From Swiss-Prot:
InterPro entries for this protein: FUR (IPR002481), Fur_C (IPR043135), WH-like_DNA-bd_sf (IPR036388), WH_DNA-bd_sf (IPR036390)
Encoding gene (name): zur
GO MF term (any one): transcription cis-regulatory region binding
Domain of life: Bacteria
Effect of E70A: Does not affect repressor activity
Organism: Bacillus subtilis (strain 168)
Descriptive protein name: Zinc-specific metallo-regulatory protein
Length: 145
């Protein structure tokens, strides 16, 4: 998904174009990580000083409903990112320190299906959490300094 595809999808579903919506979508396009509503508000606050959490959440929910954004939850907080445009099946590693994601090509369901004989699986989501190499290196530098 990219910004133009997302804007077209909004238009096709009867939602009007606004600079605010485009800027919010651009924020996700420029990020390789999951973002919280607070991240979005902080990033857009200078350009839109009266922007509220309600407006942010309403748009994030709309984007999720239309399949523009995908979500995950960490420590009880919902995080958002552009829906992957990859056409192949994959999963993600998510850095708990910075939110950056890395695509994982292999799928554990390939091995688990044998254990689910007779069950009809309708879908699955697999995420691995930890610390990315950049954050690990930064953490090691901070502890040795």
């Amino acid at each position: 998904m990219n910004v133009q595809e997302a804007l077209n999808l909004l238009k096709e579903n009867g939602y009007k174009y606004t600079n605010k919506r485009e800027d919010m979508l651009q924020l996700f396009a420029d990020s390789d990580r999951y973002l919280t509503a607070k991240n979005v508000l902080s990033a857009l606050n200078d350009d839109y000083p009266g922007l509220s959490f309600d407006t942010i959440y309403r748009n994030l929910s709309l984007y999720e409903e239309l399949g523009i954004l995908e979500t995950t939850e960490l420590s009880g907080e919902k995080l958002f990112r552009f829906k992957c445009s990859f056409t192949h099946h994959h999963h993600h590693f998510i850095c708990l320190a910075c939110g950056k994601t890395k695509e994982i090509e292999s799928c554990p369901m390939d091995k688990l299906c044998d254990d689910l004989d007779g069950y009809q699986v309708s879908g699955h989501k697999f995420e691995i959490y930890g610390t990315c190499p950049d954050c690990t290196a930064e953490n090691q530098e901070n502890t040795t300094a």
